[in-house]
Regions:
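Long, low-complexity segments enriched in small/aliphatic residues
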Residues: 46-114
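Conserved ATP-binding subdomain of kinase catalytic cores across diverse folds
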Residues: 1-74, 117-220
Length: 220
């Protein structure tokens, strides 16, 4: 992703390689640092926007970080509603944008609906009770980021107490981690790859999405 971002911004291949090397080196250094900290301190370690801004010396990059943060705060379901949905025969539906967003077959849509029911059971009870009040209106296949190329990904539109009370749920296929072959013992065993992704994301993030969960579609 770092290399592709460099290309997109006009950097040379050698600069892209240097950026990737720097990122990997910093990642290894941070992992080593965390391994030496007390367990509780390691658990609550976080990198927020304020800390990130103070570690960046380049003024242009700092401004870009702040701009990206402001843009991220506007990415809510109510903002996405007019852009990604339309009224069709009196019902709200997801707008198709081939090849990025495409309609599912009736069979695939039915399997996704069943998977969402299964997904509810993996949520904490209070969130399961809340989300159970929403009704699935529509779903579609959606092309997502570079790291998910070749994997199945869907978006589901759900309605709550009114036509304006909507949420979008994203469903992404998870596969076995590339580092799993180097890990031994209990931590290397995961019966469900979606569960693995959710549990580790909850462990890595100080405040993770409370609606993270998992399900199975066609044995995936």
């Amino acid at each position: 992703s770092v290399w592709i971002a460099g290309r997109q911004n006009g950097a040379t291949e050698s600069d892209c390689e240097a950026a990737v090397t720097s990122c990997v080196a910093d990642y290894r250094q941070q992992i080593r640092k965390l391994s030496e900290e007390p367990l509780l301190q390691r658990w609550y370690e976080r990198l927020d926007l304020e800390r990130l801004s103070t570690t960046v010396s380049d003024r242009t990059l700092r401004a870009e970080i702040e701009r990206s943060a402001r843009r991220a705060r506007t990415r809510t379901s109510d903002r996405a509603l007019p852009r990604f949905t339309e009224r069709r025969n009196g019902e709200r539906r997801i707008v198709e944008e081939p090849p990025l967003i495409t309609r599912l077959s009736e069979a695939d849509a039915g399997q996704l609906a069943e998977a969402l029911d299964e997904y509810l059971l993996t949520l904490p009870k209070q969130w399961r009770r809340l989300l159970a009040g929403y009704t699935l209106l529509d779903c579609a296949h959606k092309v997502v980021g570079v790291g998910s190329v070749g994997l199945r990904a869907y978006v589901a539109l759900c309605e709550g107490s009114s036509p304006d009370d909507v949420i979008f749920l994203q469903v992404k296929q998870a596969r076995r981690s590339v580092v799993a072959r180097y890990v031994h013992g209990e931590s290397a065993l995961h019966a469900h790859q979606g569960q693995r992704v959710v549990e580790y994301q909850q462990a890595l993030q100080t405040l993770s999405d409370p609606l993270l969960g998992w399900a199975t579609i066609n044995d995936r």
